[in-house]
Amino acid sequence: MLSANYIKECLKDAYKLPIEGVCKHEFVFDGLINDGAHDDVHGATTLDVAKRLLDFGFHAPTIYFPLLFHQALMIEPTETESKETIDAFIDVMHKIAAEAAEDPRILQEAPHGAPIGRPDETAAARNPILKFKDAQ
């Protein structure tokens, strides 16, 4: 509970917080803060933020859920994470927000160091390859 509230308070200046107040163990942002004219910031979406987190060694959080929010980014930190790790996550999230404002292509082309970039997720869901031999 403490970790989630700490992260939320540290990041609410860069990410839209649709529900104010104390959270239990998770909270949801609704995309990056912008001028209110668009659902994304300079073309950077929640998916872009999640993919960019991979470049910094952080597991991407749950995205686009709950469906109540168009650019939902659900943050669920474990209470066993050290303050150093939580602060590093906060720093990375601020860096990603700054990148979205300066050059959104950095986010749109992420992840940069992964062996697989951005697979066609719709095709993968419709035609899953369940055996390694089928992938060859």
Predicted regions, residues:
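Non-catalytic terminal extensions of PLP-dependent enzymes
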Residues: 3-136
